[in-house]
Design a protein with these regions (language model features):
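N-terminal strand-loop element at the rim of the active site
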Residues: 1-7, 20, 24-76
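A conserved mid-protein helix/loop that constitutes part of the nucleotide-sugar donor-binding site
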Residues: 8-16, 196, 200-225, 229, ...
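Short His-centered aromatic/hydrophobic patch
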Residues: 82-85, 103-109, 126
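Carbohydrate-associated surface elements
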Residues: 159, 181
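Aromatic "clamp/platform" in nucleotide-sugar-dependent glycosyltransferases that forms part
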Residues: 259, 278
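Short hydrophobic beta-strand element within catalytic cores of glycosyltransferases
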Residues: 295-299
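Conserved acidic donor-binding segment of nucleotide-sugar-dependent glycosyltransferases
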Residues: 310-312, 316-324, 331-337
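A short, well-ordered alpha-helix in the C-terminal region of glycosyltransferases
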Residues: 325, 332, 339-353, 362-365
Length: 370
């Protein structure tokens, strides 16, 4: 993976999986970088960590290599991949002993199929949806070379699996659907849902669509002055979102608290979870909301929400980009306490599909079959 110390969903899901696999396998996490000495997500002591590039200990020649883009073509230029990481990756992959290597990004899939030692079984794990991957610069070329040479390719939704088979006719690589697991066990009882707080979370960036959420919430907020919207996270759109809150007259009803170290507690204290992302891979926040019995309102963006939200059962699934429809669904849960509680009970029941044990069983089956 690129960076085990990151705050993002990839780091979280990798650490969760590694920790669970440690009960059954010898596990090592190999991180290209580790810019922060303190990781957001804690590895089990039985999981060994190896960092390939130590920026602090770089020689003058290594610093020069770090400024030059990767030679691993057709990987596009990106900050994580440089001549320095090329050198470290090639050496480490060539020295691997027989076992299973799981790579987490298209560029790492390509490095694995080109440079891994003989006898290593190769599994690619994708944390983004097919449409996003194939829209990126040069990524289709990378995937068209790498995926057919992998032993298995793990995607997050059935729709993504179908897309890969359609895009790569005759593909013999085993394409497996394995969802990300909950980082904690489901609650014993649903949240009380009495707080009159709608919660959302994610990077404050365009792809998360929080501007759409503010527009959908505004008419509901005008009719229900005792309800609030709390959007957790940080990112480049904080200023723009703050200004939009002001323009919509929502200063007293919308908060942007930043990051929280107790996201489960935040969810358990809310009444509804809202998602208006423009694209997702498999949104962890939705299954985390399910796990405390929180009803969902989500736009059916590509991909993920459509395979998690059961419309009218554990919440409401709204057509992508339908801001008015999203506001109507939100209003329904705000105004109907009994429906909100019914959806919350179903949400908690549905969360058991994503427990660590359920997802671990899928991974162990795959690893045993390779």
């Amino acid at each position: 993976m690129y960076d085990v110390s990151g705050r993002g969903g990839v780091a979280r899901s990798v650490v969760n999986l590694a920790n669970r696999l440690a009960d059954h396998r010898d596990v090592r996490v190999v991180s290209l970088h580790r810019p922060s000495a303190r990781s957001t997500y804690e590895l089990d002591p039985r999981v060994s960590l190896e960092v390939l590039v130590d920026a602090a200990a770089a020689s003058p020649l290594d610093r020069l290599r770090r400024r030059r883009p990767t030679a691993l073509r057709p990987v596009p230029a990106e900050k994580h991949m440089t001549r320095l990481t090329d050198r470290a990756l090639r050496r480490r992959l060539a020295s691997l002993e027989p076992g299973v290597l799981v790579s987490t990004r298209p560029s790492l899939h390509l490095a694995a199929v080109r440079w891994a030692a003989p006898g290593v079984r190769l599994v690619g794990q994708d944390h983004k949806n097919f449409s996003t991957r194939f829209a990126g610069p040069r990524q289709p070329e990378v995937l068209r070379e790498a995926v057919p040479r992998l032993d298995a390719y793990v995607v997050l939704t059935h729709a993504d699996a179908e897309d890969y088979h359609r895009e790569l006719p005759g593909l013999t690589t085993r394409v497996e659907v394995i969802r990300n697991a909950l980082p904690w066990a489901p609650a014993e009882a649903p949240a009380p849902l009495a707080s009159k707080v709608v919660v959302a979370a994610g990077r404050l960036a365009n792809e998360k669509g929080f501007g759409r959420l503010l527009e959908a919430f505004a008419p509901v907020a005008r009719d229900h002055r005792d309800w609030q919207l709390h959007i957790y996270g940080e990112g480049p759109q904080r200023g723009a979102l703050t200004e939009k809150v002001r323009r919509l007259g929502l200063d007293d009803q919308v908060r942007l608290p930043g990051y929280t170290d107790d996201f489960r507690g935040v969810l358990a204290g809310a009444a509804t979870y809202a998602m208006t992302s423009r694209a997702e891979g498999f949104p962890m926040v939705l299954i985390e909301a399910l796990s405390v019995g929180l009803p969902l309102v989500a736009m059916d963006c590509p991909r993920g929400p459509g395979e998690i939200v059961r419309d009218g059962k554990n919440g409401f699934l709204v057509d992508d980009c339908d801001i008015a429809g999203f506001g109507d669904a939100l209003r329904t849960l705000v105004e109907d306490d009994e429906l909100r509680r019914d959806c919350g009970r179903q949400a908690l029941a549905d969360s058991h599909r994503y427990t660590a044990d359920a997802v671990l069983a899928d991974w162990l089956t795959l690893l045993d079959d390779l």
